[in-house]
A protein has these predicted regions:
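Phosphate-binding loop of NTP-binding sites
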Residues: 87-146
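N-terminal leader/targeting and accessory segments in enzymes
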Residues: 1-85, 89
Length: 146
C-alpha cells in the first residue's frame, strides 16, 4: 500500500515524511512486525524497537521522537478508531463477509468453521489482517467495526 494512501485512509496527520513510498504489511505488535511494515502502536519503547526492526511507517496517537529520518510518522486522534477504519477498507478489498449474531448464536458459527471476532480491534487485528479473500467473520456487538 502506498504510504500516502495509508495516511489519507487513517485521516492521520503527517509528523515526518520518510523516503520510502509504500509498505509491505501491517502490524500492531513486535512479534508480527517485519521489515517494510507499517506499525500501529502507542508505546514509545515498542515504537523505538519497531524502528530498529525496519518499520517503514509508524502510526500513533502520541507525540513521539523522530528516531529515523527515512521513516514516515503519522499521528491519529484515536488509534483504535484508525485501526477500525483501516481494517474496514482492508477487509472490503479482500471481499470479506461479516455476519452479526446474538451472543448465544455465536456457538453455531464454530460448527460451520466461521471465524468469530472478539469485539476488540486489538485482539481481532491479526485474524483480520491475515484474512483470505471472501472469508466470513461472525461477531455479536452491533456497533463493532462501524
Amino acid at each position: 500500500m502506498q504510504i500516502s494512501n495509508l495516511g489519507e485512509l487513517l485521516n492521520a496527520t503527517l509528523i515526518h515524511e520518510g523516503s520510502v513510498l509504500s509498505v509491505e504489511g501491517f502490524a500492531i505488535n513486535l512479534n508480527e512486525l517485519k521489515t517494510g511494515f507499517a506499525f500501529f502502536n502507542n508505546d514509545k519503547k515498542e515504537i523505538a524497537q519497531a524502528v530498529k526492526k525496519g518499520a517503514y511507517a509508524i502510526i500513533t496517537e502520541n507525540d513521539i521522537t523522530i528516531e529515523d529520518k527515512d521513516i514516515f510518522y503519522f499521528r491519529v486522534e484515536n488509534l483504535e478508531q484508525a485501526l477500525v477504519r483501516f481494517l474496514r477498507f482492508f477487509c472490503e478489498d479482500k471481499e470479506c463477509e461479516f455476519l452479526l449474531f446474538k451472543s448465544y448464536e455465536l456457538s453455531l458459527c464454530k460448527t460451520f468453521y466461521f471465524n468469530i471476532l472478539k469485539g476488540n480491534i486489538f485482539t481481532d487485528f491479526e485474524k483480520l489482517i491475515k484474512a483470505k479473500k471472501g472469508e466470513i467473520f461472525c461477531y455479536c456487538e452491533e456497533n463493532y467495526l462501524n
